[in-house]
A protein has these predicted regions:
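Acetyl-CoA-dependent GNAT
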Residues: 10-13, 19-96, 107-108, 113, ...
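Conserved long hydrophobic alpha-helices within structured protein cores
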Residues: 54-56, 62-70, 133-149
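Short acidic N-proximal helix/loop "leader" segments that mark the beginning
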Residues: 1-11
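Residue-level preference for beta-strand/loop junctions
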Residues: 50, 84-85, 118, 163-167
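Generic detector of contiguous secondary-structure segments
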Residues: 43-58, 114, 118-138
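C-terminal "cap" of GNAT-fold acetyltransferases
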Residues: 120, 127-130, 138-178
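Conserved glycine-rich acetyl-CoA-binding loop
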Residues: 90, 94-108, 117, 128-135, ...
Length: 178
């Protein structure tokens, strides 16, 4: 019988932070895990083309392994407001890459981009059921300023409206020169 000895490999993988392109949209579904957000991704990309949002990706060998989206304008001024507040949302990193600092880098890149655009505050939401996200944001200097019912809806890939109820904390952070 052959004896197998466990071996470990250390990989150095290059990750590029960049804005999404049209060709990234199908890949954002992560092999079916997020297919239900297909229409959301398409609409968000169109909003980015019109200067209302940003879609920042962590790219590994031409595949998005992480993302954060930024809303630059909103009717709800406490979340996003022209040249004052930008709202970071949909922060996501593939499970096998979590704990490597990619989420932190995505948030920092979003902060740097909106600061360069003249924004002085960023806001982000942490689901009350996700204490790890809240701790991450607080470590990065975010402070809770409100609670939100977290009620929203989206149209899935089959054209069916899905309603979401995800109570959350709203956190904010001063960025750039004020």
């Amino acid at each position: 019988m052959t004896t197998f000895h466990e071996r470990r490999l250390t990989l150095n993988i290059e990750i590029t932070l960049r804005l999404a392109t049209q060709s990234d949209l199908p890949k954002l579904e992560w092999y079916g895990q997020y297919t239900h957000f297909r229409a959301v991704y398409r609409r968000t990309f169109q909003e980015m083309e019109h200067g209302n949002r940003l879609m920042i990706l962590a790219d590994c060998q031409d595949f998005p392994i992480g993302q954060v989206f930024v809303q630059l304008r909103s009717r709800e001024k406490r979340v996003a407001q022209d040249q004052q507040r930008a709202y970071l949302y949909s922060l996501r990193v593939m499970e096998m890459f979590r704990g490597c600092g990619i989420g932190t880098q995505l948030v920092q890149e979003a902060e740097a981009m909106v600061s360069a655009m003249g924004y002085t505050w960023t806001t982000i939401a942490a689901a009350k059921t996700n204490p790890k996200a809240r701790r991450l944001y607080e470590r990065m200097g975010y402070v809770i300023f409100a609670e939100d019912a977290g009620e929203w809806s989206y149209t899935d890939h089959r054209g069916i409206v899905q309603f979401v109820h995800e109570p959350c904390w709203l956190l904010e952070k001063a960025i750039g020169v004020r």
